Amino acid sequence: MMDMKENDQKRNDMMDMKSHDERKNLNSSQGKNEITFPKVLDPKKDNNGYKSYTLKAQKGKTEFYKGNFSNTLGYNGNLLGPTLKLKKGDKVKIKLVNNLDENTTFHWHGLEIDGKVDGGPSQVIKPGKEKTIKFEVKQEAATLWYHPHPSPNTAKQVYNGLSGLLYIEDDKKNNYPSNYGKNDLPIIIQDKTFVSKKLNYTKTKDEDGTQGDTVLVNGKVDPKLTTKEGKIRLRLLNGSNARDLNLKLSNNQSFEYIASEGGHLEKTKKLKEINLAPSARKEIVIDLSKMKEDKVNLVDNDETVILPIINKEKSTNKDTTPKVDKKIKLEGMDDNVTINGKKFDPNRIDFTQKVNRKETWEIENVKDKMSGMKHPFHIHGTQFKVLSVDGKKPSEDMRGKKDVISLEPGQKAKIEVVFKNTGTYMFHCHILEHEDNGMMGQIKVTK
């Protein structure tokens, strides 16, 4: 029978296990930095029909944050590595060069090849040394990757940047997007922690799996993706050391799941969420043309933004309004309120307009140092049409003829204004106290 000390120890051990299973908080991407895509490494063809490549593991410097350079590792560059594109039946020769200060290997994750060239811990390449491997590609289309596998330094070397993608390309015609870097997009997701805005694996290492608080996509912090494409194919790689990812779209839109680690599914599936374990790959196709919005977020666990996706085609095509004829700036709070920097003067005419002339007015609720407040803007003697709000088509409840539009601080609207009668008319904020405090102007409509 266990004594109390043994029970306490067992309880403590269980608590330790529980704490190690908990996910470290991951901060959302702020969408500040446009992601780029790894270059495709072009092969040389030798006389024996081999596609010939050279990969160098090397040290580098990477500016994750402006003015702050981190010591990183990369293949043929400062961080990450180029994409290799192969096809079933290809004969491949790769010269592997170790320009690091420590042992490394080159492991071909998911590639079905002879164990002698798999790149496991027993196939070490020492600092300053190189070796050449050969193999034939015998498997179907898939998204694979390569990374170091030296014992006991795999985690450190991957965390510091040694990762790259290897495609076995589609060998049959399908309708999947296939233009690399345009609509066929490699997406390497990783999480890291920065100490004083610099990468430092030693200070953040966790023996039960190092998880970071900062998301990176293709080596960019605060990543975003801007595209004009209607459909995009994301080749997702969870390149994190330890973090599981549960990915979905923030608008709850479904996507087409087309491939797993081993290649294309026999039958694609419509899903709204997928799980990516560390090292896993999955391919999905997102139809951005079905979105009402011009932006959607790829999120983890319903909340953490991994990658904001901006549909440039939607956002650039929405504001097709004509040139602006008049500008109205609503400013202030309390009794310090103005239109175009002026308080109402009954002896002043602020604007003129011809009767039956169609004009475009731009109404802006200026956001000041105090943040401002919502202002409902009203025009006497006419009903106007809302053309756009912040450059986008107005919401359904703003359709139809209107004589008042309410704008939040910082919002800007364009409206179409036609007067059918002549005379002098007021325009003003319809918070009545603001109107009384001078947030009002006059327009004279003439023949």
Curated annotation (Swiss-Prot):
<feature type="binding site" description="type 3 copper site">
    <location>
        <position position="428"/>
    </location>
    <ligand>
        <name>Cu cation 3</name>
    </ligand>
</feature>
<feature type="binding site" description="type 1 copper site">
    <location>
        <position position="375"/>
    </location>
    <ligand>
        <name>Cu cation 4</name>
    </ligand>
</feature>
<keyword id="KW-0963">Cytoplasm</keyword>
<keyword id="KW-0479">Metal-binding</keyword>
<comment type="function">
    <text>May be involved in copper homeostasis and oxidative stress response. Oxidizes the substrate 3,3'-dimethoxybenzidine in vitro. Also possesses low levels of phenoloxidase and ferroxidase activities.</text>
</comment>
<dbReference type="GO" id="GO:0005507">
    <property type="term" value="F:copper ion binding"/>
</dbReference>
<dbReference type="GO" id="GO:0005737">
    <property type="term" value="C:cytoplasm"/>
</dbReference>
<keyword id="KW-0560">Oxidoreductase</keyword>
<dbReference type="InterPro" id="IPR045087">
    <property type="entry name" value="Cu-oxidase_fam"/>
</dbReference>
<dbReference type="InterPro" id="IPR011706">
    <property type="entry name" value="Cu-oxidase_C"/>
</dbReference>
<dbReference type="InterPro" id="IPR002355">
    <property type="entry name" value="Cu_oxidase_Cu_BS"/>
</dbReference>
<dbReference type="InterPro" id="IPR033138">
    <property type="entry name" value="Cu_oxidase_CS"/>
</dbReference>
<feature type="binding site" description="type 3 copper site">
    <location>
        <position position="109"/>
    </location>
    <ligand>
        <name>Cu cation 2</name>
    </ligand>
</feature>
<feature type="binding site" description="type 2 copper site">
    <location>
        <position position="107"/>
    </location>
    <ligand>
        <name>Cu cation 1</name>
    </ligand>
</feature>
<dbReference type="Pfam" id="PF07731">
    <property type="entry name" value="Cu-oxidase_2"/>
</dbReference>
<feature type="binding site" description="type 1 copper site">
    <location>
        <position position="439"/>
    </location>
    <ligand>
        <name>Cu cation 4</name>
    </ligand>
</feature>
<feature type="binding site" description="type 3 copper site">
    <location>
        <position position="380"/>
    </location>
    <ligand>
        <name>Cu cation 3</name>
    </ligand>
</feature>
<feature type="binding site" description="type 1 copper site">
    <location>
        <position position="434"/>
    </location>
    <ligand>
        <name>Cu cation 4</name>
    </ligand>
</feature>
<feature type="region of interest" description="Disordered">
    <location>
        <begin position="1"/>
        <end position="43"/>
    </location>
</feature>
<comment type="similarity">
    <text>Belongs to the multicopper oxidase family.</text>
</comment>
<dbReference type="InterPro" id="IPR011707">
    <property type="entry name" value="Cu-oxidase-like_N"/>
</dbReference>
<protein>
    <recommendedName>
        <fullName>Multicopper oxidase mco</fullName>
        <ecNumber>1.-.-.-</ecNumber>
    </recommendedName>
</protein>
<feature type="binding site" description="type 3 copper site">
    <location>
        <position position="430"/>
    </location>
    <ligand>
        <name>Cu cation 2</name>
    </ligand>
</feature>
<feature type="binding site" description="type 3 copper site">
    <location>
        <position position="147"/>
    </location>
    <ligand>
        <name>Cu cation 2</name>
    </ligand>
</feature>
<feature type="binding site" description="type 3 copper site">
    <location>
        <position position="149"/>
    </location>
    <ligand>
        <name>Cu cation 3</name>
    </ligand>
</feature>
<feature type="compositionally biased region" description="Basic and acidic residues">
    <location>
        <begin position="1"/>
        <end position="25"/>
    </location>
</feature>
<dbReference type="GO" id="GO:0016491">
    <property type="term" value="F:oxidoreductase activity"/>
</dbReference>
<feature type="binding site" description="type 1 copper site">
    <location>
        <position position="429"/>
    </location>
    <ligand>
        <name>Cu cation 4</name>
    </ligand>
</feature>
<keyword id="KW-0186">Copper</keyword>
<feature type="binding site" description="type 2 copper site">
    <location>
        <position position="378"/>
    </location>
    <ligand>
        <name>Cu cation 1</name>
    </ligand>
</feature>
<dbReference type="InterPro" id="IPR008972">
    <property type="entry name" value="Cupredoxin"/>
</dbReference>
<dbReference type="Pfam" id="PF07732">
    <property type="entry name" value="Cu-oxidase_3"/>
</dbReference>
